[in-house]
């Protein structure tokens, strides 16, 4: 996909790579921005916090971290498996600029991305509150759909529901 330099690989590695890319751009005086997406369950990984600490230390204001905060991971609800909440307060404690949004509201997302571009001297974290599978009755807020693709019948049923919205 054009503009996507890499997939994240194992949990926690994406943000580490993003921090490296953002730092390299700063050192090269390149004004490109780096965006990375984390799952809330992924924030259980220590590497996420090491990378965040580095991003803040190096004042990587060209880095925007978007956290998909849906409280679901492959083995259960994040707050029951190993709670990482409150995410916003944790990222603030690591000296990041934090913006909380409804992850299903495009206007809020656009405004947050604009605010991130305008923030200087620190990385921005957008904590996007979402509902996994939103808009598809049999997928919505269901842990079992984590990492599972729908079969053809399920796909058509899901698309029918989404097109009706």
Range-by-range predicted roles:
Residues 1-165:
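Glycine-rich ThDP/TPP pyrophosphate-binding loop and its adjacent helix/strand module
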């Amino acid at each position: 996909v054009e503009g996507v330099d890499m997939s994240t690989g194992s949990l926690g590695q994406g943000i580490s790579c993003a921090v490296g890319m953002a730092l390299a751009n700063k050192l090269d005086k390149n004004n490109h921005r780096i965006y990375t997406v984390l799952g809330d369950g992924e924030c259980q990984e220590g590497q996420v916090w090491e990378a965040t600490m580095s991003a803040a230390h190096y004042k990587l204001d060209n880095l925007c971290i978007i956290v998909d905060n849906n409280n679901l991971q492959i083995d259960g609800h994040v707050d029951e498996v190993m709670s990482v909440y409150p995410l916003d307060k944790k990222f603030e404690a690591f000296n990041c600029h934090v913006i909380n949004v409804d992850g299903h509201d495009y206007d809020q997302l656009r405004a947050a991305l604009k605010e991130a571009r305008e923030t200087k001297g620190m990385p921005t974290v957008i904590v996007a509150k979402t509902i996994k599978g939103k808009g598809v009755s049999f997928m919505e807020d269901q842990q079992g759909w984590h990492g599972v693709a729908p079969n053809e019948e399920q796909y058509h049923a899901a698309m029918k529901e989404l097109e009706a919205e």
